Regions:
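Conserved active-site and SAM-binding loop architecture
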Residues: 1-212
Length: 212
């Protein structure tokens, strides 16, 4: 029996571990959009999943001007430094002999990366949304500051809620959701309570909910 192709929005996409898992299960899929601001992760994603090579970077003929590439990458907060709380300076490559701008701009284009999730007004419909939100503030190796809306990086989880609520209004909810994160999310009592509440919210707006 032939498996039907599904469309995917991969949020906090990193290097594409979620779409790799989907494909390893033998499920054909089409990536509608990704969302990440780690420029090196986007570069890796495009290399692993989208056919980005040095040869392609050198032979691609449809680049906009360097000023425009720098503007576009800055606009989506690609490379934003959270420790220094400042955007990446893409404009420093405008007059460079290197092809840094071309490399990252093309990686961003091929991976269909929308950049900073907090800047997105809505997401186009996809059957499946995956979201591996930052574990910085909940993992044992992290700051343990918790999932606080608008205050911590792990609080970016609430951007998914915002986009789902918008999708609900647009009658464009996904059929499936997959959240991936560290085990402690279900171990600490505060996190456990929060995540049970999250599942309750998801049950209100989506079709298929499960915990693995």
């Amino acid at each position: 029996m032939k498996t039907e192709k599904i469309t995917v929005n991969e949020l906090f996409s990193g290097i594409g571990a979620q779409v790799s898992a989907i494909r390893r299960l033998g499920i054909p899929c089409e990536i509608k959009h990704t969302s990440d601001i780690d420029h090196n992760a986007v570069l890796a994603y495009a290399s692993i999943h989208c056919g980005l090579t040095e040869e392609l970077i050198n032979t691609y003929t449809e680049y906009p001007t360097r000023e425009e590439m720098a503007r576009q990458l800055t606009e989506i907060n690609l490379g934003y430094d959270f420790q220094k709380n400042k955007p990446y300076n893409w404009y420093r490559f405008v007059n460079s002999k290197s092809k840094e701008l071309e490399k990252y701009w093309l990686a961003n284009k091929l991976s269909r990366n929308l950049g900073d999730i907090s800047k997105l007004e809505h997401l186009d419909y996809a059957d499946f949304w995956t979201y591996s939100f930052p574990c910085t503030d909940i993992s044992v190796a992290g700051k343990q500051e918790g999932i606080k809306q608008g205050q911590t990086r792990s609080g970016l989880l609430y951007e998914v809620q915002r986009l789902l609520e918008k999708a609900n209004k647009m009658l464009a909810l996904p059929k499936y959701l997959m959240l991936e994160n560290v085990k402690i999310l279900w171990v600490k009592s505060l996190n456990h309570s929060l995540m049970n509440g999250w599942l309750g919210l998801m049950n209100l707006v989506t079709i298929h909910i499960g915990k693995f």
